[in-house]
């Protein structure tokens, strides 16, 4: 049986565009195959969900504060009216520990991201030349991908 998905074309497109929008069949399996192929080509990979991402640059790359959920009546004396702010390390910090490797950030459920959030992901890729980002933008009958900038033009400008 021939190898159906070698990942060569995907790797070439990822190298040239740095940021891809991908449409995979809903039954799954393609993501892990492509991730395995990219790891074999020397990428360090990190997969996470795009839900609840907020500001992508701050959430993925910088130390930021998160307020815990409000749990009803609490005393105002200790923490003020807004509550205490807990510092959270960047979600993709383990991806940026090694500077010598190419890095691949794979975001699931990318269809929930707004146009400005997608544009900030492209900006993150242009600032870090070793980082590539793949955003899953929904399902399709067959595996397809295109540059994220082309997806933004097609989806939001029309």
UniProtKB/Swiss-Prot annotation:
Disulfide bonds: none annotated. It is an enzyme of class 7 (translocase). The keyword Transport applies. It is a peripheral membrane protein. InterPro entries: NAD(P)H-quinone_OxRdtase_su_N (IPR020874). It catalyses: a plastoquinone + NADH + (n+1) H(+)(in) = a plastoquinol + NAD(+) + n H(+)(out); a plastoquinone + NADPH + (n+1) H(+)(in) = a plastoquinol + NADP(+) + n H(+)(out). It comes from the Bacteria. Its EC number is 7.1.1.-. Its main location: membrane. It holds the Pfam family NdhN. It is found in: Cellular thylakoid membrane. The keyword Metal-binding does not apply. GO terms for cellular component: plasma membrane-derived thylakoid membrane. One of its GO terms (molecular function) is oxidoreductase activity, acting on NAD(P)H, quinone or similar compound as acceptor. Keywords: Membrane, NAD, NADP, Plastoquinone, Quinone, Thylakoid, Translocase, Transport. NDH-1 can be composed of about 15 different subunits; different subcomplexes with different compositions have been identified which probably have different functions. Belongs to the complex I NdhN subunit family. HAMAP family: NDH1_NDH1N. NDH-1 shuttles electrons from an unknown electron donor, via FMN and iron-sulfur (Fe-S) centers, to quinones in the respiratory and/or the photosynthetic chain. The immediate electron acceptor for the enzyme in this species is believed to be plastoquinone. Couples the redox reaction to proton translocation, and thus conserves the redox energy in a proton gradient. Cyanobacterial NDH-1 also plays a role in inorganic carbon-concentration. This is NAD(P)H-quinone oxidoreductase subunit N. The lineage of its organism: Bacteria, Bacillati, Cyanobacteriota, Cyanophyceae, Synechococcales. The gene is ndhN.
């Amino acid at each position: 049986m021939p190898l159906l998905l070698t990942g060569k074309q995907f790797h070439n497109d990822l190298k040239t565009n740095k940021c891809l929008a991908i449409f995979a069949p809903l039954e799954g399996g393609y993501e892990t195959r492509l991730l395995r192929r990219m790891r074999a080509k020397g990428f360090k990979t990190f997969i996470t969900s795009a839900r609840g991402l907020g500001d992508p640059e701050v959430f993925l790359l910088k130390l930021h504060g998160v307020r815990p959920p409000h749990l009803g009546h609490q005393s105002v004396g200790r923490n003020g009216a807004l509550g205490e702010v807990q510092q959270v390390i960047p979600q993709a910090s383990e991806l940026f520990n090694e500077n010598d490797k190419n890095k691949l950030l794979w975001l699931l459920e990318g269809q929930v991201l707004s146009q400005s959030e997608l544009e900030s992901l492209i900006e993150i890729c242009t600032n870090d030349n070793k980082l590539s980002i793949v955003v899953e933008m929904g399902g399709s009958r067959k595996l397809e991908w295109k540059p994220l900038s082309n997806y933004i033009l097609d989806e939001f400008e029309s």
